[in-house]
Amino acid sequence: MAFGVDLVTFYHPSFWGVSDYAQIAALAGRDLPAFWNKLFDAVRDSGVRGVETTFSPFHWRDAVAAFGSAEAVATALTARGLTLASGFLVDLDREADLASAAAQARILAEARDYARFIRACGGGVMVVGMPCRRTFLLEPVRVVDLAMAASLADFINRLGIETAREGVRLALHTEAHSVFCAPRDIDLFMLLTDPRYVHFCPDSAHIALEGGDPVAVAARHQERICIAHWKDATAGMPIDTVIDAGIHDRHKPFFCPMGEGIVAWDRWADLIRARGDAMWSILELDAAPDPVAAIRAGHAYAGSLTC
């Protein structure tokens, strides 16, 4: 089984020798080549082979700016025995009005460019995060009903067609507190999207945060899984958790090292293994203070399940 890491794992001030997130961005801005070389060296030292790019300063455009071209990024990876496994598209949750034609056109254009980068660097999957829900009972209350889901699913289908034209599969990621993480919501969007163009990236910890059984949910859509995020959680989060710009930080206290939480890892590993050894399994540890040690530990634990 092939293992990689999402670069969000390195989004911790301690790793960079600074005191907050803003200083990480400032450090990257001062010397992008040094920033990305340190990043790729750390991935190499962690023992996994695959890289998943994500939001800035770990964005694919940052990588191109650091090395000069997509081909140069690929060369930098190959020199370290690495490859691009996938790229995470964050744009859907960052548009104020995702239903607008202008916003959709921007995202489609970004996805097209991103897919070309992914292919140039040896990858074949674009993972996409879905828009957030609203806080429970926050006025005006919004529900995820058929009309809302159908409209968004139509755009997701178009997005999947766009990336498929570039040879890249689009996979929906189960981000907690998004419209695609509670078991019913996952089932709904899997029903409404076309399986030829829209695939599935189950994230074990995020499904658990929403009160779901990661294995049961993933098993219902096993044939559409083309990549998976491996992460553990201690418990589900309260239904009235505030959903705002700080939601990702609220998730972090509920995450834990693999094997110390509620994910049924033996069953999860069996399910993912059944999809084939060539599929990427991404270790995503959300801002680890010592990311290299954390990835090594997670990789060793996952390896003990899959050998």
Where are these regions (language model features)?
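N-terminal pre-domain/capping segments
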Residues: 1-121, 299-307
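Hydrophobic faces of well-ordered beta-strands that scaffold small-molecule active sites
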Residues: 3-9, 51-53, 84-88, 126-128, ...
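Acidic/histidine-rich catalytic cores of soluble enzymes
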Residues: 18, 51, 153-256, 262
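A short acidic, glycine-rich active-site loop
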Residues: 25-34, 145-151, 250-262
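Acidic-and-aromatic substrate-binding clefts and catalytic sites of carbohydrate-active enzymes
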Residues: 30-33, 54-69, 92-98, 103-107, ...
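Structured loop/turn residues at beta-strand edges in well-structured enzyme cores
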Residues: 46, 121, 196, 219, ...
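Active-site acidic/histidine proton-transfer and metal-coordination neighborhood
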Residues: 76-79, 96-200, 266
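A short, acidic, amphipathic alpha-helical segment used as a generic capping/interface helix at domain edges
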Residues: 260-274
